[in-house]
C-alpha cells in the first residue's frame, strides 16, 4: 500500500479476476468495505496538506490539512510545499471530549461518518470527517460501545506523530519515528 500511495494517484482493486473497485488512492483507502484488500493492520488514509512552518527547536514541521494543523517530525521541505501524509488507522485514537495532559500532539475535531464492526474480532473501523478530508481509526468494539459512538457524533481524533511516514513525502529513507 505504501508504494501505491507514493507512486500513484489512482488504484484498482481486483477480486475473483474482475475489477471490484477503482478510483483515487485516497478515496479507496477511506472505504471501509475494502479493508481486506487494503490490509486491516496497515489500513489508513492519505491526507493532502501543505507545510506551513517548521520548529527548529523541536525538529518538527506544521502541516495544514484544511482548517486544521498537524505537527509531524521535521520534513525536508520548504514552507508552501504540498504533501501527502499516510495516517494508519491503528495510529488514530478517538475521544468524545478534548483530552489534556497527554503526549499526543495532534488533536483534531471530527465527526463520525461510518462505523464498521468486525464481527469475528474485537475491533471496529471508524471513519471520521476532519473537515475537507477523512481519517480512519481502528479501535476496539468495546471502545465504540463505551464512548457511545454513533454516525454523526462529534469526536476528537488523536493522531500519534509516529503515524507520519517520511517515505510518503518522497524520501526513500526509513520511516519517521518519534
Positions of predicted regions on the chain:
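Generic beta-strand structural signal
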Residues: 14, 54-56, 87, 117, ...
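Short beta-strand-turn/beta-hairpin segments enriched in glycine/proline and small hydrophobics
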Residues: 125-135
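Exposed loop/turn and edge beta-strand positions of beta-sandwich/beta-sheet ligand-binding modules
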Residues: 45, 106, 122
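Glycine/charge-rich catalytic "coupling/switch" loops of P-loop NTPases
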Residues: 69-116, 134, 138-178
Amino acid at each position: 500500500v505504501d508504494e501505491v500511495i507514493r507512486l500513484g494517484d489512482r488504484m484498482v482493486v481486483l477480486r475473483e479476476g474482475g475489477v471490484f473497485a477503482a478510483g483515487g488512492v485516497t478515496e479507496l483507502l477511506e472505504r471501509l468495505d475494502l479493508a481486506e484488500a487494503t490490509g486491516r493492520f496497515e489500513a489508513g488514509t492519505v491526507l493532502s496538506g501543505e507545510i506551513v512552518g517548521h520548529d527548529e527547536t523541536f525538529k518538527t514541521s506544521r502541516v495544514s490539512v484544511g482548517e486544521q494543523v498537524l505537527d509531524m517530525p521535521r520534513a525536508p521541505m520548504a514552507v508552501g510545499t504540498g504533501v501527502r501524509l499516510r495516517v494508519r488507522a491503528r495510529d488514530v485514537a478517538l475521544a468524545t471530549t478534548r483530552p489534556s495532559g497527554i503526549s499526543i500532539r495532534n488533536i483534531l475535531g471530527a465527526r463520525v461518518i461510518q462505523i464498521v464492526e468486525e464481527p469475528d474480532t474485537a475491533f471496529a473501523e471508524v471513519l471520521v470527517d476532519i473537515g475537507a478530508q477523512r481519517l480512519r481509526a481502528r479501535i476496539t468494539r468495546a471502545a465504540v460501545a463505551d464512548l457511545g459512538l454513533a454516525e454523526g457524533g462529534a469526536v476528537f481524533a488523536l493522531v500519534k506523530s509516529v503515524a507520519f511516514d517520511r517515505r510518503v513525502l518522497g524520501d526513500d529513507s526509513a520511516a519517521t519515528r518519534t
